[in-house]
Amino acid sequence: MTTLKLNTLSARIQAHKMALVHIVKPPVCTERARHYTEMYQQHLDKPIPVRRALALAHHLAERTIWIKHDELIVGNQASEVRAAPIFPEYTVSWIEKEIDDLADRPGAGFSVSEENKRVLHEVCPWWRGQTVQDRCYGMFTDEQKALLATGIIKAEGNMTSGDAHLAVNFPLLLEKGLDGMRAKVAERRSRINLTVLEDLHGEQFLKAIDIVLEAVSDHSKRFAALAREMATAESRESRRHELLTIAENCDIIAHEPPKTFWQALQLCYFIQLILQIESNGHSVSFGRMDQYLYPYYRRDVELQQSLDREQAIELLHSCWLKLLEVNKIRSGSHSKASAGSPLYQNVTIGGQNLVDGQPQDAVNPLSYAILESCGRLRSTQPNLSVRYHAGMSNDFLDACVQVIRCGFGMPAVNNDEIVIPEFIKLGIEPQDAYDYAAIGCIETAVGGKWGYRCTGMSFINFARVMLATLEGGRDATSGQVFLPQEHALSKGNFANFDQVLADWDNQIRYYTRKSIEIEYVVDTMLEENVHDILCSALVDDCIERAKSIKQGGAKYDWVSGLQVGIANLGNSLAAVKKLVFDQGAIGQQELAKALAEDFDGLTHEQLRQRLINGAPKYGNDDDSVDELLARAYQTYIDELKQYHNPRYGRGPIGGNYYAGTSSISANVPFGAQTMATPDGRKAHTPLAEGASPASGTDHLGPTAVISSVGKLPTGAILGGVLLNQKLNPSTLENESDKQKLMVLLRTFFEVHKGWHIQYNIVSRDTLLEAKKHPDQYRDLVVRVAGYSAFFTALSPDTQDDIIARTEHTL
């Protein structure tokens, strides 16, 4: 078996990492806000795609650039290290409200200088009434606004941040280079017919792409010039040589395809960076990096030996730390659902390729190098994912477990055995299905060929819909009734449990439809107001169709719905079925009163203990609850299938919805807005995250958990089925334990058809100490949901949620 070196970092990489993790309250950068405002004001006569292209070009030409930390990969998002840019075209309302309190937010604090406050107070008023968020609220119906105000449905993220959740076509970029991409645009423009309305709009889009690609080239040359200037003043010969190489790399990739591994990695990083300058959307991912960079790695490391493996790993480390520098500021409410300010920049390795119609294992030496580099660095970025398949070698699986044992929540593992065949059933070409990658948290898509948002825009609070089901359609938190129904526990008029399920079906269909209606508004406003030019240029077939992704330019376009509180739904329904209807141990009105009073008082607390201990819980391989949850969830899946997204019929294959379970950290704020539930959960406490069991309810070990998850209709939940498991570090101390985990992984994926799994390998005691002494644990990384975060950067509520999760042994 290959033994990875997992305890080695070069001095400069260690210093760079420590410098970043000790930035507790990063600054805000207003350069982008100022530059975009200037260009929008100057070019009001231009079509929006051209206006946005000119704004991005102006910003790339004028913004502050720097090279620090003896880095080998260069490029900064903002004027200061880890500073978060402001994107006023999406929203200014929360910025103006929260600007003076940003430093005091728990787990998501930012420092704002007086000068930056002055700039924001200067630029924000101009944007009032014309941001994406403002225009969404101008289009929402009163009913939609009321639903959003209650928080049963939450859709703030895309109104205030944009889309993303995709990987662009890095292989095409590497093949053609920036000049080659401009030539592709020029050829398409040569076939434009300006007497055709669609082509008239298409010409403006293609013109915008050319402006942006030229700006990206010039931006690369700015870094080349800076590196040369720094080299002249550098006294260390080795660093001077590195700076000159950086300059040469940046000059070459400004126009030509890269020739070396270093150049290829630099070009990919520049694009990754500028995508996150163009748009504030997160989960911009690299796709299958071990596949498209391997030819360069093979040439430099294996054949010509112009670069040794350790040098290649240091280049990867430099790239990973540059990803960690990228930052994003969210509103106070949105930051609670994305605890730890994550960017979800996913890198996928492993899996299979389709060669002459036959699947072949895709693992190569770069797969191991990327895996090892992440294991050594133990950072939150990139979000590393491994594609598992039945033919994966024990050697590579063993290497993955070695890194899992490092305890930073990576790699997450996705399952080819379910994703690929289900993608092919959808209508994805087999060659593309075998080329899928993890996106953001656990979502999956085909890099460079899939539209935005392979995961949904809005979250539905399943627990609150369930409570409305039990109480005449009344939302227990707000008191509002959106879909009235006859039956209510407080009336004692449910004749049987079948009526409960029937009312659930009606309620979840209503809320699902309303979430799609809301997404339609947001999608439309994003399409009309914030064309993402560079991103569209690097997704097939946007150039050929002369359409942005939002206009239907992508080859594929499916979107998943999202929800929070899956396990709470199953556990609550199971408790009601068994204790109220099957046994008659608890009366309908008795339960309604206990829930309304949050189990206050001795009698209600005794009832609560019966709900907790006397009813089955999801995660323990109990069919009575697992199958009930699957049945309730199936209604949601079936309803989603009824709808098309706004790109349907406009070009892409697909254009439909399917389910997904990535709840990020929304289970904590959603729980804070949810009253007591029949599973015994108290009001205002966290809900279950993803498809994982509710904290503390999975008592029979990890094997029982994976069996329960496998009973969900995973083949229909193509947006991903997120399973977090927490293991005590002592569980993986010896070779025998490692083998147990490997067997568990193979069983989960091959027998139970699991979609995804990830592990926290950290003890409760360590987490409690880190909460008590944060300065001593700044580099402690934990798995939150489909992403990892620095534990001390999380809010206390999210820290407590992670501490409370069940700690298993093998």
What name fits each language-model region?
Residues 2-206, 238-245, 249, 253-810:
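Conserved catalytic cores of very large enzyme subunits
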Residues 207-218:
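Extended non-globular scaffold/tether segments
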Residues 217, 224, 228-231, 240, ...:
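Heptad-repeat amphipathic alpha-helical coiled-coil interaction surface used
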Residues 221, 225-228, 574, 807:
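Short amphipathic alpha-helical segments enriched in leucine
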